């Protein structure tokens, strides 16, 4: 009888330890952060859904960290987050302190991986495929009228057109001044336009050309046209996943799951997803799920 009691006590103790162990596991989900912008919310949802389905690990997603890179990177270093979507030139310039143009786009990923591993014990996994950089945008009507395909084409007729941009872009050296110098642009007039009103001003005909980003929601509709940066003036911002190395060790299936994001998005696809959220009012989680299902990356 005494032996049975001891065995029962040991069994109960083992169960308590087992339950505690399970509870501990649940308290340590993979922690993902995103910047405060629409496409980052959708990317965070994609990463979350892929990881949860492919690996079974629990994910804790924190959307919209104020300050973006400047606050997420220090939090990553402290272990407060395990991974987040980041842009190549943001890492190269803002985090590592390099200058734009020091390395080619082809070399960028391997250089980032090398320096992040050395400095932070982190790495970059895959490139999603899209490039969120500055874009020069005009209306389809103006593009047809003046036969505009590139920024060099724009330079030939810029003295007949009005440019409207947000004050920050118009003032910063690598924005409008640098673009104008690179292409010899000389607009009839330049107007300050609030960042949220640029496309509306373009649509109304108040301006003919504006600055945007290559994945802006409005670009997914065919009433506007992005002019090709044929002199490669703009710095490229390709998106990838920054992840702590210890997270890859702790969660064995994580790396191969993150690799599934490689090459799945183009500028046009990302702009379309942004449009669905911003203009059609869809939830980011729904948009992410529909996209991943269409790509064959989710089963349900």
Please provide the spans of the model-predicted regions.
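C-terminal motif of bacterial Sec signal peptides marking the signal peptidase cleavage site
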Residues: 17-21
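Ligand-binding "clamshell"
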Residues: 95-106, 110-125, 206, 218-232
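A conserved helix-loop-strand patch within extracytoplasmic ligand-binding domains
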Residues: 106-162, 245, 263-267
């Amino acid at each position: 009888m005494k032996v049975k009691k001891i065995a029962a006590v040991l069994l109960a103790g083992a169960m308590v330890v087992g339950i505690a162990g399970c509870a501990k596991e649940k308290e340590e989900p993979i922690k993902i952060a995103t910047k405060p912008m629409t496409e980052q919310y959708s990317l965070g949802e994609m990463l979350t859904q892929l990881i949860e389905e492919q690996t079974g690990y629990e994910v804790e997603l924190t959307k919209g960290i104020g300050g973006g890179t400047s606050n997420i990177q220090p939090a990553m270093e402290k272990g407060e987050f395990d991974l987040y979507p980041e842009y190549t030139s943001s890492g190269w310039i803002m985090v590592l302190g390099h200058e734009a143009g020091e390395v080619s786009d082809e070399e960028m990923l391997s250089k980032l991986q090398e320096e992040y591993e050395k400095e932070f014990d982190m790495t970059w996994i895959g490139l999603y495929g899209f490039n969120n950089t500055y874009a020069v945008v005009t209306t389809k009507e103006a593009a047809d009228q003046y036969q505009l395909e590139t920024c060099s084409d724009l330079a030939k007729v810029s003295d007949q057109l009005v440019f409207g941009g947000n004050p920050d872009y118009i003032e910063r050296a690598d924005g409008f001044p640098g673009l104008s110098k690179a292409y010899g642009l000389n607009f009839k007039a330049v107007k300050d336009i609030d960042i949220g009103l640029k496309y509306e001003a373009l649509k109304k005909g108040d301006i003919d050309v504006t600055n945007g980003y290559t994945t802006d929601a409005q670009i997914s509709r065919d009433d506007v046209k992005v002019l090709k940066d044929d002199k490669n003036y703009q710095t490229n911002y390709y998106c990838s996943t920054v992840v702590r190395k210890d997270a890859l060790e702790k969660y064995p299936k994580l790396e191969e799951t993150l690799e599934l994001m490689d090459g799945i998005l183009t500028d046009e696809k990302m702009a379309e997803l942004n449009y669905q959220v911003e203009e059609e009012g869809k939830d980011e989680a729904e948009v992410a799920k529909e996209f991943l299902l269409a790509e064959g990356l989710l089963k349900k």
